[in-house]
Amino acid sequence: MNLENVLCQINAYHCILHLPSFRAVVSSNDHSGTLRCRAGRTATTPSPFDRAFLFGEGIYEVCLLVNGRFVDMDSHLARLDRSLAACGMTPPPERPQLERIINDLARRNGVTNGLAYLQVTPGATPRSFTAVPQDRATLFILTQAQDFLSAPHLSRGITVQVRPDIRWLHRDIKTIMLLPQVMAKRSALANGFDDTIFVDEQGITEGSSSNIFIVTDAGTLVTRPLSDHLLAGCTRQRIITLARDAGMTVEERIITRDELSRAPEVFATSATYLVVPITRIDDHVVGDGGIGTVTRRLQDAYIAFIRALAATGAP
């Protein structure tokens, strides 16, 4: 099934797809679903009254692509569904159809290593907090080429600052409202760090775009339990599964600020970070300043998992 045919089957969405030399859009005004493509320009754009523009209302996902295979796509799309349901937003196309669109877009763009970004927004309304969208929702997808498995930070590690978590209290919803995260990352760079770890009144919540793990002196892997205080990371869950399969002890509990400072190993996980060692926290060097034994073991296990998946080739 080619991309044009897939798009024409979707009646509830604009499908805005970033391609190398043009953007393809199914026009909301053309109910026949005709695909309009114009080199170097956009045939139809989302309305400036889309609630994503006016209120930051929308949900997104980022999925890693290696050798034409998306990693844990089922988990990412399941989380997308949960986030949309939590916000009362229109669900995306049926899972098999959405997967075909994403895979076809990656092929058309010639992207075999990189990521796919999906964003769902409610559509256009008058500027009112309570207005109910009457137009189609907007589904935006792009692919981006990048070799995340060769990223220097995988061996070099990253440095982080710790800052109060000022975000809202439904961090389990993967919303496009990312201003606190943007501010945290900019603050980190301005202060000579790579990233930020957030802390609330209980302890460590998560990184600005990652989940956080520590390794205790006894070799136990610890990460904060899932709640509305943090995102249910797909890579986080994969690492927990790989660790337990390898016979490691894993605890999901609160990590205090003091425990974070004393941990011999700390690392972050995300779709694009993979498993990245944290070598310095504020002015404190973690362990010997390099990648720890447990961190290396889990990083190797995760990359091996990805490579085994990628060896099967594009679907």
Where are these regions (language model features)?
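Helix-start/capping segments and mature chain N-termini
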Residues: 26-104, 121, 130-315
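Ordered, amphipathic secondary-structure segments that act as subunit-interaction surfaces
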Residues: 111-120
